[in-house]
From Swiss-Prot:
InterPro entries: FAD-bd_PCMH (IPR016166), FAD-bd_PCMH-like_sf (IPR036318), FAD-bd_PCMH_sub1 (IPR016167), FAD-bd_PCMH_sub2 (IPR016169), MurB (IPR003170), MurB_C (IPR011601), MurB_C_sf (IPR036635), Oxid_FAD_bind_N (IPR006094). This is UDP-N-acetylenolpyruvoylglucosamine reductase. The keyword Cell cycle applies. It comes from the Bacteria. The lineage of its organism: Bacteria, Pseudomonadati, Pseudomonadota, Gammaproteobacteria, Chromatiales. It is an enzyme of class 1 (oxidoreductase). Pfam families: FAD_binding_4, MurB_C.
């Protein structure tokens, strides 16, 4: 890896780190390397040392991610809690780094009397992950707020880009290859802080009432098909409670798969495949996974 060692970075660099403790499903084999930068400057310096072809996985809170049991080659860069600054730049503009949790961003905006980010309180991930997949909930989506992003690439190059440089759609974002989000500039609207905070509490009550928040899971497993809901289709096919090994379709919300305590990544992946096949056969609808699957089988 071009001479990179724990002694040459200020952050945390370890080899053969089991990813089960770094993902919200609590499954996954080892990463060849895991690096947690000390700060943004340390991250940029680290990227300068990397070979151009180094496989990279940027990790936030580990939601919406399935790491297979055989693990992943290359380097995992863990940014949650590191790139964690939020600033109000103008009356209606907020600048936020990619390692900030979506919930923290939503609460910050509400306290500042800014409206439009309340939906982010229900997304169990970081701003970086929300940017990468155009995450959404309760009718809102991340890129509706974005006015600019800051990105970095292999070699440590970093720059500012505008939304028109990306192709953004439902749960998909396509832009320049081998670049990753460092921060975003968001435009919101002025409003009442108390009303915004009440809205967040209402949305969280709604989420907590129907999602398995006390069990290891990764968020929604499948994208919603056009004009329908993946959870409704899965439930209509009688799949609530269906299980393979330690992975089970949640009885609270059919578009969630939970780890009952001893699941492997293979259990989760096989259950995802079986649910998709069953819905296709019974309902004639092809469900597309929202979960990002990486690594090799055991």
């Amino acid at each position: 890896m071009g001479g990179i060692s724990a002694a040459s970075v200020r952050g945390w660099l370890r080899h053969h780190v089991v990813m089960a403790s770094h993902t919200s499903w609590r499954v996954g084999g080892p990463a060849q390397r895991l690096y947690r930068p000390a700060d943004r400057d340390d991250l940029i310096a680290f990227l300068r040392f990397l070979p151009r072809n180094e496989p990279l996985l940027w990790l936030g809170l580990g939601s919406n991610l399935l790491v297979r049991d055989g693990g992943i080659s290359g380097t995992v860069i863990a940014i949650a809690g590191v790139l964690n600054r939020i600033e109000r730049r103008t009356d209606t503009t907020v600048w936020v780094e990619a390692g900030v949790s979506c919930a923290k961003l939503a609460k910050f905006c509400a306290r500042e009397g800014l409206r439009g980010a309340e939906f982010l309180a229900g997304i169990p991930g970081t701003v970086g992950g929300a940017l990468a997949m155009n995450a959404g909930a309760f009718g809102g989506t991340m890129w509706e707020l974005v006015t600019a992003v800051e990105v970095a690439g292999i070699g440590g190059e970093h720059c500012r880009r505008l939304p028109q440089e990306y192709q953004v759609s439902y749960r998909e974002v396509h832009g320049p290859e081998r670049e990753w989000f460092l921060a975003a500039e968001l435009r919101l609207t002025l409003g009442n802080s108390q009303v915004a905070q009440q809205q967040i509490r209402r949305l969280l009550r709604q989420r907590n009432g129907c999602q398995p928040i006390r069990q290891p899971c990764a968020g929604s497993v499948f994208r919603n098909p056009w004009n329908d809901k993946a959870g409704r289709l899965i439930e209509a096919c009688g799949l609530k409670g269906a299980s393979i090994g330690g992975a089970r379709v949640s009885e609270r919300h059919a578009n969630f798969i939970v780890n009952t305590g001893n699941a492997s990544a293979a259990d989760v992946e096989h259950l995802i495949q079986w649910v998709a096949e069953t819905v296709a056969r019974q309902a004639g609808v092809s469900l597309v996974p929202e979960v990002h699957m990486v690594g090799e089988p055991a």
